[in-house]
A protein has these predicted regions:
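Feature detects amphipathic, helix-rich regulatory segments
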Residues: 1-180
Length: 180
């Protein structure tokens, strides 16, 4: 995976519309989300490559050390519409679903525990170089595709079950209210 540091900008660069700056708040659980609180900057302030669908967005620094290292695959953004912010890293790889799934495993949790500086009120910080220098066992490209596809399907099934549960809870709440 190739990682890149995020955009730093001045308050005067912020606009109501423009290029969206992806931040830690765009990672909800393990999903990519766009929100009303997203920040936009004037295009002239952008001096890095834009984020693309299937890039991996990683929180590199945060006031809460437990949020450092959270990650997700970027989906559903138009070309040239967003960049990652200064406290974020962006990973690009041929097999994003495999790499993102591997970042949910024990090696990554241990890596975060060992390498994230912070605590006692300090801002948690994940070094790009520390992440780049991690050595992990990587299966062949074909195996990565199969494993990545499996986890993508699993994520999809989990999402479907969460939606079903949410809808059922609404139905049961309505039934309960009608019974009363």
């Amino acid at each position: 995976m190739t990682t890149r540091r995020g955009l730093t900008y001045k308050p005067s660069d912020i606009r109501k519309n423009g290029v969206r700056v992806l931040r830690s708040s765009n990672i909800t659980e393990d999903s990519f989300t766009l929100g009303d609180e997203d920040v936009f900057v004037v295009r002239e302030a952008v001096n890095i490559d834009c984020a693309r669908a299937n890039d991996i967005l990683i929180t590199a620094a945060n006031g809460s050390s437990r949020l450092v290292g959270k990650h997700t695959i970027i989906t559903g953004i138009p070309e040239e519409s967003a960049v990652h912010g200064g406290f974020m890293l962006l990973g690009t790889t041929k097999e994003p679903h495999f790499v993102n799934a591997s970042m949910g495993s024990s090696w990554y949790r241990r890596f975060i525990e060992l390498f994230v500086a912070g605590g006692n009120g300090a801002i948690g910080n994940l070094s790009k170089n520390d992440l780049d220098n991690q050595e992990i066992a990587i299966p062949s490209e074909e195996e990565q595709k199969i494993i990545g596809s499996f986890f993508r399907q699993l994520d999809h099934l989990i999402t479907l079950h969460q939606r079903k549960r949410s809808r059922l809870s609404v139905i049961f709440e309505i039934e309960h209210l009608q019974f009363i």
